[in-house]
Amino acid sequence: MALNELTLREAADKLATKEISSVELTQACLDQIAKHNPTINAFVTVDAEKALAAAQAADARIAAGNGAPLTGIPIAHKDIFNTTDMRTTCSSRMLENFIPPFDATITTHLRQAGAVILGKTNLDEFAMGSSTETSYFGASRNPWDTQRTPGGSSGGSSAAIAANMAICATGTDTGGSIRQPASLTNLTGLKPTYGRCSRYGIIAFASSLDQAGPMTRTAEDAAMLLNVMVSYDPKDSTSIQSPAPDFTQALTGDVKGLKIGIAAEYFGDGLNDEVRAAIETAQQQYQAMGAELVPISLPNSGYAIPTYYIISPAECSSNLARYDGVKFGYRCEEPKDIRDLYFRSRSEGFGDEVKRRIMLGTYVLSSGYYDAYYRKAQQARRLIADEFKAAFEKVDLILTPTSPTTAFKFGEKDDPVQMYLSDIYTINVNLAGLPGISVPCGFDSKGLPIGMQLIGRPLDEETLLRSADAYQRQTDWHKRRVHLG
């Protein structure tokens, strides 16, 4: 196996025993990027010089006996996390040349752990999309089939790992943006409990929904990366003051007696038959491992899409009001007056999908419509959260499909509503603030990956990771790799 195809655990073990060096590992990833990024378009920015310097520093740290599990590991960083030494674009013309004055808290954690940041990965503009097609820098391509999307908004991160350009990656998840791309590219993607990972220095889309998380090849890798990402941060007013365990200690391989909820609402019309079959096989495997399947009902799940597409645009319209061409970001040429500056800078700097959501958000917050839309959406959100809370009195976790289909072709979902529906199974998790993980569970007849989603109680990432890891010990779906040549 090539160095750049190693799991995070395998790479960390080889680095710790000095079987390989971080410079060798980093160079293998950089070589793969140079060879395949022109086609895959996973990275928006790559800084090979800085990456190799960080790798040399990591090797020195390991040689001195000061290494940690992430020391020397080449990682792809979603281009929504602030980095002082690299531009942070959010894949938008608005921030095309923006270099932040401070690092995101998670960026700081990665640096302190000795991780090697290879570069910044592509995403849907300001994380608004499910395919990376809204990126100002063009769509990323799925290494399993380059005519198809790697998902979104964290599609650059998922494509980078699937194409063996990085050992692991960071992502953010507002309505499924870690889990859906993980499902479409045969990866493990974890969206933690809201507030687990600091949002400080992450460019905001919808502040009550955004959450950072790991994208990796295995559940064990996700636990290792999550250990570095989770912390209480006083700079983030929504950060949870809860002790962070060593998530790798939860990986016992045992799910005997675990009660897994199966909600009929997640298996209705619109679910691809091959995806349904793969999920049902995974259910049977959990039963064979000693878990108990418990039928549950989540009838308010049907309100997920309309609720999300009222709340998230409302928050987006507020968050993106700061981009006006005055202080930072894109500025139109020769504005006639302040109104012209605002109007043209925002019209030229934002893409169509971002403008669509800003307008929708402004509308639902406007006088006369606030009560009719926004207030009702918040009430629906509470009903959805309460429904999950009641379900978790009967079960330990809930098993669903991650996405209703496998990876779709570019341009196939040109109707915005069709694109929005690709997150139908993931959005509720964000609305309720719960942790969720997508795990590889099969392939369709076209050879495209299928993912299943596990949903857990608040702050119980340990049960999710234990269950995902136990499944991966019994299956080999996650071990399958793309070989681009």
From Swiss-Prot:
<keyword id="KW-0067">ATP-binding</keyword>
<feature type="active site" description="Charge relay system">
    <location>
        <position position="153"/>
    </location>
</feature>
<dbReference type="InterPro" id="IPR020556">
    <property type="entry name" value="Amidase_CS"/>
</dbReference>
<dbReference type="InterPro" id="IPR004412">
    <property type="entry name" value="GatA"/>
</dbReference>
<feature type="compositionally biased region" description="Polar residues">
    <location>
        <begin position="138"/>
        <end position="150"/>
    </location>
</feature>
<dbReference type="InterPro" id="IPR023631">
    <property type="entry name" value="Amidase_dom"/>
</dbReference>
<feature type="region of interest" description="Disordered">
    <location>
        <begin position="138"/>
        <end position="157"/>
    </location>
</feature>
<feature type="active site" description="Acyl-ester intermediate">
    <location>
        <position position="177"/>
    </location>
</feature>
<protein>
    <recommendedName>
        <fullName>Glutamyl-tRNA(Gln) amidotransferase subunit A</fullName>
        <ecNumber>6.3.5.7</ecNumber>
    </recommendedName>
</protein>
<dbReference type="GO" id="GO:0005524">
    <property type="term" value="F:ATP binding"/>
</dbReference>
<dbReference type="GO" id="GO:0030956">
    <property type="term" value="C:glutamyl-tRNA(Gln) amidotransferase complex"/>
</dbReference>
<dbReference type="GO" id="GO:0006412">
    <property type="term" value="P:translation"/>
</dbReference>
<keyword id="KW-0547">Nucleotide-binding</keyword>
<dbReference type="GO" id="GO:0050567">
    <property type="term" value="F:glutaminyl-tRNA synthase (glutamine-hydrolyzing) activity"/>
</dbReference>
<dbReference type="InterPro" id="IPR000120">
    <property type="entry name" value="Amidase"/>
</dbReference>
<comment type="similarity">
    <text>Belongs to the amidase family. GatA subfamily.</text>
</comment>
<keyword id="KW-0436">Ligase</keyword>
<comment type="subunit">
    <text>Heterotrimer of A, B and C subunits.</text>
</comment>
<comment type="function">
    <text>Allows the formation of correctly charged Gln-tRNA(Gln) through the transamidation of misacylated Glu-tRNA(Gln) in organisms which lack glutaminyl-tRNA synthetase. The reaction takes place in the presence of glutamine and ATP through an activated gamma-phospho-Glu-tRNA(Gln).</text>
</comment>
<dbReference type="Pfam" id="PF01425">
    <property type="entry name" value="Amidase"/>
</dbReference>
<dbReference type="InterPro" id="IPR036928">
    <property type="entry name" value="AS_sf"/>
</dbReference>
<keyword id="KW-0648">Protein biosynthesis</keyword>
<feature type="active site" description="Charge relay system">
    <location>
        <position position="78"/>
    </location>
</feature>
